[in-house]
Swiss-Prot record:
Protein name, UniProt field: Unsaturated 3S-rhamnoglycuronyl hydrolase
Protein induction: By ulvan and rhamnose.
Family label: Belongs to the glycosyl hydrolase 105 family.
Record key words, sorted: Hydrolase, Periplasm, Signal
Location in the cell: Periplasm
Annotated Pfam families: Glyco_hydro_88 (PF07470)
Record lineage: Bacteria, Pseudomonadati, Bacteroidota, Flavobacteriia, Flavobacteriales
Any coiled-coil regions, as ranges: none
Annotated organism of origin: Formosa agariphila (strain DSM 15362 / KCTC 12365 / LMG 23005 / KMM 3901 / M-2Alg 35-1)
UniProt xrefs under InterPro entries: 6-hairpin_glycosidase_sf, 6hp_glycosidase-like_sf, Glyco_hydro_88, PolySaccharide_Degr_Enz
Record's signal peptide: 1-25
Length: 377
């Protein structure tokens, strides 16, 4: 009798295990494979350094934000080693244009290191503080609107990419140093950009004032006569919102604004996801360049997965889209680890190819993986 009961118990365990494995396989995610792909991407990118202006520029800033997020999720010291190595060789410096949001993006990684390495004197955030103070409080021609008003460069963050580059840094710095004034200043300038570039009907951001319709014949349009909304540009914004919310206090007085904006944009991005999982470079005219693009799609995947993992987005509605997107992103990675199908540096929709890559594309890939890994937890 005991033997029969033992056999029945063993059979139940085996059947249960088999069903669990089957369900896990149906979900289409394998943690070990995701982690391996992320490490391969890191190793390839570290062996093939690239930047637009300098090792402290925005392209490296975006890449090392991805490395930071990968470390935060996995705690794999390969990521931290890469972070510390670049910070050491950069001497903890930002790039040089104090009025330009792009040039402080690299500081996200410095602050992240400081939050995880408490050795006295190891991390130097003084260059970051000097940049942020000058960026927020010193006069410049963009704030004054002089000489650039014809181009719409009349506010500090006049292009939507800026909402990824500077606000998460200011927010993280406020958290790390316990100085909420930096978050309050961030909100002030964020609202300027929101009011100037956010299209409430489309629930998307124009990249800059060139693409904001004014009701004239000069309005820029896609071949299908629709507005031009750039995938990576909106990826910068939505990915940046997830970064902001992740480190923003739950009782922050303006948090509801950011949560609502995040959910509004997320719902629109979900509506625009193509069947193969990857968003096209032109969101409202996907046929213009009818192939997936990794940088925008990577930021969307990160943001949507973060929203699911943190209870802001409905799991049943968004998780299938996230998994489909991750599978498509993974298929864009070459055998050696290089992540292809990344649109080159630009400011509007352009094509990509299997062989086009950029460090910020790798960063987007790592960010996506860092949140997709959490879906099964």
């Amino acid at each position: 009798m005991k033997n029969q009961a033992l056999k029945i118990l063993t059979l139940c365990v085996l059947v249960g295990s088999a069903m669990s494995l089957k369900l896990y396989a149906q979900k289409g995610l394998n943690h070990s494979e995701i982690e391996a792909k992320m490490i391969k991407a890191l190793e390839w990118q570290e062996a093939h350094p690239i930047f637009a202006l300098a090792p402290t520029d925005w392209t490296e800033g975006a890449y090392y934000i991805g490395v930071s997020r990968a470390h935060k999720t996995t705690q794999d010291m390969m990521y931290m080693a890469a972070l510390k190595n670049q910070a050491y060789w950069n001497n903890w410096q930002t790039y040089s244009r104090l009025h330009h949001a792009d040039d402080v993006a690299i500081s996200y990684s410095y602050i992240y290191i400081g939050m995880n390495d408490k050795r006295p004197g190891f991390v130097n955030l003084e260059p970051t503080k000097k940049f942020l103070d000058a960026h927020l409080h010193e006069d410049d021609e963009w704030k004054a609107g002089t000489d650039k008003s014809a181009s719409g460069k009349t506010i500090l963050w006049w292009w939507c990419d800026a909402l990824f580059m500077a606000p998460p840094v200011l927010n993280l710095y406020a958290k790390h140093t316990n100085q909420p004034k930096y978050r309050d200043e961030m909100h002030k300038y964020y609202m300027e950009t929101y009011n100037q570039l956010y299209d409430k009907e489309e629930r998307l951001f124009a990249r800059d004032m060139r693409f904001v319709w004014k009701g004239t014949e000069k309005d820029l349009k896609e071949p299908n006569d629709k507005k031009i909304f750039w995938s990576r540009g909106n990826g910068w914004v939505l990915g940046g919102l997830a970064l902001l919310l992740d480190d923003m206090p739950n009782d922050y007085k303006h948090r509801t604004f950011y949560e609502n904006l995040f959910k509004d944009m997320a719902s629109r991005i979900l509506e625009l996801q193509p069947k193969d999982g990857l968003w096209r470079t032109s969101l409202l005219s996907p046929e213009t360049y009818d192939h997936g693009e990794v940088s925008g799609s990577g930021f969307y995947t990160f943001a949507l997965a973060w929203g699911v993992n943190n209870g802001l987005l409905d799991r049943n509605k968004y998780e299938p889209a996230v998994k489909k997107a991750w599978k498509a992103l993974a298929d864009c990675q070459h055998e050696d680890g290089r992540v292809g199908w990344v649109q080159n540096i630009g400011a509007s929709p352009e094509p990509a190819s299997a062989d086009s890559w950029q460090n910020f594309g790798t960063g987007a890939f790592l960010m996506a993986g860092s949140e997709v890994l959490k879906l099964e937890e």
